[in-house]
Amino acid sequence: MEKVREIVREGRRVGKEDPRRVVHAFKVGLALALVSSFYYYQPLYDNFGVNAMWAVMTVVVVFEFSVGATLGKGLNRAVATLVAGGLGIGAHHLASLSGPTVEPILLAIFVFVLAALSTFVRFFPRVKARYDYGVLIFILTFALISVSGFREDEILDLAHKRLSTVIMGGVSCVLISIFVCPVWAGQDLHSLLASNFDTLSHFLQEFGDEYFEATEDGDIKEVEKRRRNLERYKSVLNSKSNEEALANFAKWEPRHGQFRFRHPWRQYLAVGALLRQSAYRIDALNSNINSDMQIPMDIKKKIEEPLRRMSSESGKSMKEVSISLKNMTISSSFDIHVVNSQSACKTLSTLLKSGILNDVEPLQMISLMTTVSLLIDIVNLTEKISESVHELASAAKFKNKKKPSKSNSGSIGQAMPNKSHDDDDHVVTILGDVDTSNNVDQSQSHGEISVDSCHHVTIKINDDDSIHDKNEDGDIHVHTNRVSCDHTNASDLLDSGVKKN
């Protein structure tokens, strides 16, 4: 009895995780009930005979969870059955011309050659990804048609009935899959990618609190709960196979919603690959946080501000990308956070060069530099992800994000200036939208700017000595000298720190 209760609980859990699974089960039952009428209804049975069972078999093996998977399998099975049936009839005809003695030998040779070649072709990566099931059905159908034709006089009628029932079963699956609560693989892939961005952004935004705040004895349970929430990123580490399968299924699907035919699904895989690289760094970062060797808090505090900003701004950038993907809009807001994370990286570089950690023990230095190196990697990957997402948005024709019309400019975001920079790196503050209906010549202290568009973005660039205003048409374009973050600063400091200690 306890076993039954456990099965019921498991069924409820699976159904609650994704209610579409329950609907899919009913859809399969409906398809099987429909094609079973070929066998139960006497006029249909008189026409197809026992071959009606091929329709039932087709539903069982073709009906998949998503529309793309069902379409892919259905088309593979139909085309493979048609081609294999034609070749089987041709092989039977050629073999019959050689006489009853040689006929079985030729049929065996034909079956051997085609089965061997087809099986070898299944190892091709492209065939394995999209046509493996079709090649398998081709081998099965050719063997059945050619071999059974040796004992069957009406070989053409046999092939016709099998092909007809297979097509009927496949069409039933496709129609029910598309028109009864459809599940689109393309939509699932799109949602999965947006969810992965959101998951990683959660870790990066919470990293500062986890790394720099000391754990009080009374807060151990709360800290453990927070750590479990942070480890949600692990689902991204193993998402490659799922993403590739969904992208493969999505290629079979017709246009639906905002996903047109020949949607750039390959670009989704490129973005997902970069995201997994970030997840691997985050996994290493999390392991370093939870390692037995912990760095004293007073040492961490020396570089707390830039590290917090690097992780927080990278997390905010990924959060903005997640929102942009969910809404399928083109937004440049996450570029601002990328610039801010690069600015924080430059601040960290300046601090490290100043020798602020010269008194740190070598072993502590190694642990600290591991964290720094991983965060620098994540910042650089965030910039690559931003560029890849822009390519995806352009290829997929995402909508332009609507900008609120304002008569007066107002500050909507600011990147903190860094006074410690050796170079004149610009830090950007976006002031807002400026509406101009006519051509206006604006004279600034550093030159003249001609404004000839209805919508502009005012960008204020803070330098150490002066302030410049800049207007640009259309989307926000941030022009600034991005910092190139690499491992040289961390490795150089580690070498010098070890030598000094």
Swiss-Prot record:
It is a multi-pass membrane protein. Residues 398-425 are annotated as: Disordered. GO terms for cellular component: membrane. Its main location: membrane. Induction: Up-regulated by aluminum. Keywords: Ion channel, Ion transport, Membrane, Transmembrane, Transmembrane helix, Transport. InterPro entries: ALMT (IPR020966). It is found in: Membrane. The chain crosses the membrane at residues 22-42, 52-72, 78-98, 101-121, 130-150, 166-186. One of its GO terms (biological process) is monoatomic ion transmembrane transport. PANTHER family: ALUMINUM-ACTIVATED MALATE TRANSPORTER 10 (PTHR31086). Belongs to the aromatic acid exporter (TC 2.A.85) family. Malate transporter. This is Aluminum-activated malate transporter 2.
